Regions:
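Intrinsically disordered, low-complexity acidic/Ser/Thr/Pro-rich linker and tail segments
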Residues: 1-77, 121, 125-131, 383
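Eukaryote-specific detector of the first structured module of a protein
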Residues: 48-113, 117-119, 374
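Canonical WD40 repeat/beta-propeller blade segments in eukaryotic WD-repeat proteins
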Residues: 36-41, 45-53, 90-96, 147-153, ...
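Residue-level detector of Asp-centered blade-edge/turn motifs that repeat once per structural unit
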Residues: 56-58, 99-100, 156-157, 197-198, ...
C-alpha cells in the first residue's frame, strides 16, 4: 500500500472491516485449546519455604537463548538451569511459549523450530545437562523466511503461529502442517509482530519506521502509522484488554495510540480505530523491546543503555515508575509474570535477571550463557483443566 505523508503517528483509516473471526487452522500441538488461562501468577506462589523446585519446574516455564547456540530452561525460583538444548543452526533471536506451556517456539536464521517443554526433561539431574547442551530434535520446523526471523507469537489456542523476518514478510503458519497459510509483504525488514487479544488482528513494525495493523478477516493491512520517517521502529505491544498500542524506536522514543472497536456504516462490520495520545523520550539510545504488563498498568522498556525502565500507564501519562539497574551491557528482551509482579530480562552481559517490581530489586540471576542472551520467554499462568 502507498505510504501516507509524514506526520506524527499518521493513521491510514481502515478500509473495509473485520468480523473478528480467527483463521481456520488445526492445532498441531495435538490439543484443542481446552486449557484456559486464569490468574494469579504461579511466580508469587513459589516461595522456597512452601514449594519445591519440582513444583516450580511444572508451574513456571522460563526459557532464555542467544548467541551461544543454546536454549536454556530454568527453575525460576532457584535460579538453576534444568535443561540445555543445542541450537547449532544459528543464534536464537526470539522465543515464544505456547499458551498450554508444552512447547517453545524458537526463531533463528530462516527458520522457526518447536521444542517440547517437557517436565521430565526439565527435572533431569544437573549432571545430565552439560553447559554445551544436549542435541534434541525439534518436533516441528517452519522454513521459508530468508535471513533472520525476528519475531514470533502464538495464537491463543495454539492453532497457528505468526512470524516476522528480515526478508520483509509476515507469515502465518498452520502448526500441524508447518505450512504458511498467509504471507504479508511489509516492504521492509520486520522487527516485531504481535497478535491482538481479539485474535483477529496483528500489529507489526519495521526497519523503515512504520507500524502496521493487519486485519485477518479482511486479509489486508488496515492501518499504517509512520511516527518518524526512516527511524527504525523496534518493538510493538498491545494491551491485554486491547485498549492501546505502544511502539518504540531506535531513537529511544515511545508512541502510544488508543485502540477502539468501531462499526463501519457501509457494511456494518467491526473494525479498529486508532487515536494518537502521547509520545515520550524513554531512553537516550536504542530501545530494544517494549512490553505492556498483563494487567496493563505498566510498560517496560529495555535499551542499549543497560537499563530496564518501568512506566505507569495511568491515564496515558506514562510516568517513570522505576529504573531497573544491574545489567552491564545492552538489555535485549523482557517478559512479565502473569500477575505483573515480576519481570525477567536478558542481556548481552550473558545474564538473565528476575526482578521484583514492587522493590525494583533483582531476586535471581540466571547464569550459564557464554555469549549474549538476547531473548527470554516466561509463562507462569495457571491452567485449569
Amino acid at each position: 500500500m502507498a505510504k501516507p505523508p509524514l506526520g506524527l503517528y499518521y493513521s491510514t483509516p481502515a478500509q473495509g472491516t473485520c468480523d473478528r473471526r480467527t483463521m481456520a487452522a488445526t492445532d498441531a500441538t495435538g490439543h484443542s485449546g481446552e486449557h484456559k488461562a486464569k490468574p494469579p501468577s504461579s511466580m508469587t506462589q513459589i516461595p522456597s519455604s512452601s514449594k519445591s523446585i519440582e513444583q516450580d519446574a511444572l508451574s513456571v516455564v522460563l526459557v532464555t537463548a542467544g548467541y551461544d547456540h543454546t536454549i536454556r530452561f530454568w527453575e525460576a525460583w532457584s535460579g538453576l538451569c534444568s535443561q540445555t538444548i543445542q541450537y547449532s543452526d544459528s543464534q536464537v533471536n526470539r522465543l515464544a511459549i505456547s499458551p498450554n506451556k508444552r512447547i517453545v517456539a524458537v526463531a533463528g536464521n530462516g527458520t522457526v523450530r518447536l521444542y517440547e517443554c517437557s517436565p521430565a526433561a526439565a527435572m533431569m539431574s544437573h549432571s545430565d545437562t552439560p553447559s554445551r547442551g544436549a542435541s534434541v530434535s525439534p518436533i516441528s520446523s517452519f522454513d521459508g523466511h530468508y535471513g533472520n526471523v525476528t519475531s514470533i507469537a502464538w495464537h491463543c489456542d495454539g492453532k497457528w503461529l505468526v512470524s516476522g523476518g528480515e526478508d520483509g514478510t509476515i507469515k502465518i503458519w498452520d502448526t500441524r502442517t508447518s505450512r504458511p497459510q498467509r504471507v504479508y509483504d511489509h516492504k521492509s525488514p520486520v522487527n516485531d509482530v504481535v497478535i491482538h487479544p481479539n485474535q483477529g488482528e496483528l500489529a507489526s513494525c519495521d526497519q523503515s519506521g512504520s507500524v502496521k495493523i493487519w486485519d485477518l478477516g479482511e486479509n489486508k493491512c488496515s492501518h499504517e502509522l509512520i511516527p518518524e520517517e526512516d527511524v527504525p521502529m523496534r518493538s510493538v505491544s498491545i494491551a491485554s484488554d486491547g485498549s492501546c498500542l505502544v511502539a518504540a524506536n531506535n531513537k529511544g522514543r515511545v508512541y502510544v495510540w488508543k485502540m477502539r472497536s468501531g462499526v463501519a456504516e457501509a457494511d456494518q462490520h467491526e473494525h479498529t480505530e486508532l487515536e494518537p495520545v502521547t509520545k515520550f523520550q524513554a531512553h537516550d539510545t536504542y530501545i530494544t523491546r517494549c512490553a505492556l504488563s498483563p494487567d496493563a498498568r505498566y510498560l517496560a522498556t529495555c535499551s542499549a543503555d543497560t537499563t530496564v525502565k518501568l512506566w505507569s500507564t495511568s491515564q496515558y501519562r506514562f510516568a517513570l515508575n522505576k529504573v531497573l539497574q544491574g545489567h552491564q551491557r545492552w538489555v535485549w528482551d523482557v517478559s512479565f509474570s502473569a500477575d505483573s509482579a515480576y519481570l525477567v530480562s536478558a542481556s548481552s552481559d550473558h545474564v538473565a535477571r528476575l526482578w521484583e517490581l514492587s522493590s525494583g530489586k533483582t531476586m535471581r540471576q540466571y547464569n550459564g550463557h557464554h555469549r549474549a542472551a538476547v531473548c527470554v520467554a516466561l509463562n507462569d499462568t495457571s491452567l485449569e483443566p
